[in-house]
């Protein structure tokens, strides 16, 4: 979203970089690497540090942190990394994505950012007022993109029990605002974390690591919604069309639009894995549900009823 790429464009560029052997497999949802890959990280970071964009951001001979090392959390493919191949003759767009991956790698294996955080609570006329302040003591990973220079709220060296002089007061009146429209970035994030609000503990646990779609399919899901006219892009926002709103009004109360259904299926798949349920039984349940929801949707006049085509009959 920062550079104006759609999710599909980003995935296409990442695929090109992968085919050029510049990055590892891009269709991964993992943020972790196993031990054997971690052994290669110092060499890869040193390689990134030879590139002009990052030469001042990689500390020579620094030991990479292990925050992202956990073989148990690696799915089919480990986290996205650059390889040791030189990124030569890249287009502007390809270069942007490549260096985003390289920069995130440096951040992931840099030291923690250390802050001194101060919380002051002051009492006046029976009312308590709180202010927070922080000062970065060690920039760590924030130094990669210069985030340590962001404005910090510093608080004077007050001591507990100090009496302060009131210099003025004001009342600010405002109204709550609805959540903004989704961008591709926020929608991708929402798809990835879908299910966290499910109340049923078992279903929420089943959804923990899946969400809606996969890293390989989420971009195409968004693109399909656009191509079928359910939404359109307005600058960086995704806006539902009249057709999309009509679809939502029909299916929003159906199980097909309930993220908990995905949790139920994941739970059933786990039972199959444990030998508690036969795959054939699960398949028949899915087939029956598919027939049911298809019939229900096709009978909906709001979606498939007759309407004026806008074309005159030639006869």
Language model feature labels by segment:
Residues 2-12, 26-315:
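Basic, low-complexity terminal or inter-domain segments flanking catalytic cores
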């Amino acid at each position: 979203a920062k550079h104006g790429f759609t999710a599909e464009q980003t995935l296409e560029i990442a695929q090109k970089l992968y085919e050029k052997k510049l990055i590892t497999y891009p269709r991964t949802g993992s943020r972790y690497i196993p031990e054997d890959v971690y052994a290669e990280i110092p060499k890869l970071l040193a390689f990134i540090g030879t590139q002009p964009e990052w030469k001042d951001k990689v500390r020579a001979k620094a030991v990479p942190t292990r925050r992202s090392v956990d073989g148990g959390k690696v799915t089919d493919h480990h986290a996205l990394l650059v390889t040791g191949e030189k990124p030569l003759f890249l287009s502007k767009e390809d270069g942007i994505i490549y260096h985003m991956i390289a920069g995130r790698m440096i951040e992931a294996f840099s030291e923690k950012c250390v802050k001194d955080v101060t919380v002051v609570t002051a009492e006046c006329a029976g009312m308590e007022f709180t202010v927070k302040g922080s000062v970065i003591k060690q920039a760590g990973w924030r130094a990669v993109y210069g985030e340590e220079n962001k404005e910090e709220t510093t608080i004077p060296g007050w001591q507990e029990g100090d009496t302060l002089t009131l210099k003025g007061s004001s009342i600010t009146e405002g109204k709550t605002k609805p959540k903004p429209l989704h961008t591709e970035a926020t929608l991708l994030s929402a798809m990835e974390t879908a299910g966290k609000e499910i109340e049923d503990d078992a279903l929420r646990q089943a959804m923990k690591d899946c969400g809606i779609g996969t890293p390989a399919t989420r971009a195409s899901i968004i693109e399909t919604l656009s191509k079928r006219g359910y939404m359109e892009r307005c600058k960086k926002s995704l806006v539902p069309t009249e057709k999309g709103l009509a679809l939502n009004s029909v299916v929003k109360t159906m199980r097909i639009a309930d993220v908990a259904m995905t949790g139920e299926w994941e739970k059933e798949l786990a039972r199959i894995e444990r030998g508690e349920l036969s795959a054939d039984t699960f398949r028949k349940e899915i087939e029956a549900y598919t027939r049911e929801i298809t019939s229900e949707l096709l009978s909906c006049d709001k979606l498939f009823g007759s309407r004026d085509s806008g074309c005159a009959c030639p006869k």
